[in-house]
Amino acid sequence: MTLREVSTASDLREFYDVLISGAGPAGMTAALEASAAGARVAVLDENPRPGGQIYRDITRNRPERKSYLGPDYWKGKQLAEVFDRSTIDYAPRATVWSLEGRDETVAKVRNVVGVTVGGSARMIEADAVVLATGAQERPMPVPGWTLQRVMTAGAAQIALKAAGAMPSEPIVLAGCGPLLYLLASQLIDAGVSDLTVLDTAQSTFRMSVLRHMPEFLRSPYVLKGIRLLFKVKCQACVVSGVRSIAITGSERAEGVRFTTAGGEQAIPASSVLLHQGVIPSTNLTNAAGCELRWNDEQRAFEPVTDNEGRSSRQGIYVAGDGSGIAGAQAAEVSGRIAALAALCDLGLVSVTAVAARLKPLHKQARRFLRGRAFLDALYTPRSSFLAPLNPETVVCRCEEITVRKIREAIALRPPGPNQLKTFLRCGMGQCQGRLCAATVTEIMAEERKVSPADVGTYRLRSPVKPVRLAELAQLPHTARALKAVTGRDPVDHDTNETGHISCPDTDIASCGQVQRRRPTSAGIVA
């Protein structure tokens, strides 16, 4: 048996029992579970090889990098090798840009997925779709974050895993969260000697943190976390209690100014890595109409699911960090659980057999979730970083919208973030809000003195990722393809004499005012 790697969209089948978006820990285990039950399975992933962000390039990485990437990274190799020996259809470098859920009221009994592979687009049907899209880094807009040589900690870690590349020294690593110290440890082991960690986490001795301490002490993360903190604090310059950060430089980062209880300081920097935690990637779940809810502990929106990963839309399941941040081991278990739920709902595995498999999996999941509440409370970002105070800080990098402009627009009392778009185009650039949505929600909540749950987030529509018109032009002119592109029902369009649905210039413009070489609000690139 061997993995069936797909290089173009035409190589994909028209229908799958289970279609999975994402080839990280959750996506791989979901695919293996479904394939073992005899289901027709496809995995669509943006990366060139399976593994996701946590196990990036695990199948081809060099042994000499083992010393600094650590044992947790190499745990993923066995899973990736099992995945590689399966008979699953696997499409690397694939972009999933549309997902329409089932709607039996109009006789649409299958999910429809829009995907681009190898420069061509295609619509695929699936009885069940498992979204294992993982997490994304929470944006950390500070003055100077748009300068050259400033990147997220996650981006630096990707370069380290994929190419063994390291930022130029001296390096400043700023923010909060477990990844901050993990990356610091990896950089130290890789040979970095001039490293400063600016820890923006609030005091550990808060009641919201201490009440979760007993459970955390029983978790599998305690000793690992203590060793990590001790190592970094012994081998790098760690500054705790940082309250504000500004990156200085004309065209590229040259230094960092920061404040603590002791006052303001400035240090030189050739590279600045920012990080303040991760949040679920909800673009597809949002665009598919799945219900989202605000998680106040993780300061993020997440899809509403049951204990088996079923979303509010029939036939759509969510697994891994895309349903709530829990880590790689929990994601592996979550993928298996979601796949079993899908197989049961499709009648491919009996209810009795699924129940027997789920019991030990739920037990494992509870073990991996133990201590998560402590970490969420400990690394809750400061409000001044969630909703930046400096009025000239850029929030929307695509459209260059500052904090000042956003606060001025909020003063005009738009109902929510979606209406704010019409004032500023904030969130209408090529990233489609991935880098600004969380910050806009936090600023609006602060201005109105309400919870982010009352504010909401951007409402997304397909395409949720940038797609070229040349790729979309290869789609057959069917009703479902046209709706995936324009977001409009087929009844709104004319049908020509040959039976094809026409899409006049006005329809294309309604997708987001297409301009040459400029991304539109719908993610279309001319």
Curated annotation (Swiss-Prot):
EC number(s) per entry: 1.-.-.-
Annotated InterPro entries: BFD-like_2Fe2S-bd_dom, BFD-like_2Fe2S-bd_dom_sf, FAD/NAD-bd_sf, FAD/NAD-binding_dom, Metab_Enz_Cyan_OpOx_G3PDH, Opine_Oxase_asu/HCN_bsu
Broad EC category: oxidoreductase
Keyword Electron transport: no
Domain of life: Bacteria
Molecular function terms from GO: 2 iron, 2 sulfur cluster binding; metal ion binding; oxidoreductase activity
Pathway(s) of this molecule: Opine metabolism; octopine degradation
Cofactor: how bound: Binds 1 [2Fe-2S] cluster per subunit.
Binding site for [2Fe-2S] cluster: 396, 398, 431, 436
Entries under Pfam families matching the protein: Fer2_BFD (PF04324), Pyr_redox_2 (PF07992)
UniProt keyword annotations, A-Z: 2Fe-2S, Iron, Iron-sulfur, Metal-binding, Oxidoreductase
Cofactor: [2Fe-2S] cluster
Function: Oxidative cleavage of octopine into L-arginine and pyruvate.
Family the UniProt entry places it in: To T-protein and to dimethylglycine dehydrogenase.
UniProt subunit comment: Heterodimer of a subunit A and a subunit B.
Name of the protein in question: Opine oxidase subunit A
Species of provenance: Rhizobium meliloti (Ensifer meliloti)
Name of the encoding gene: ooxA
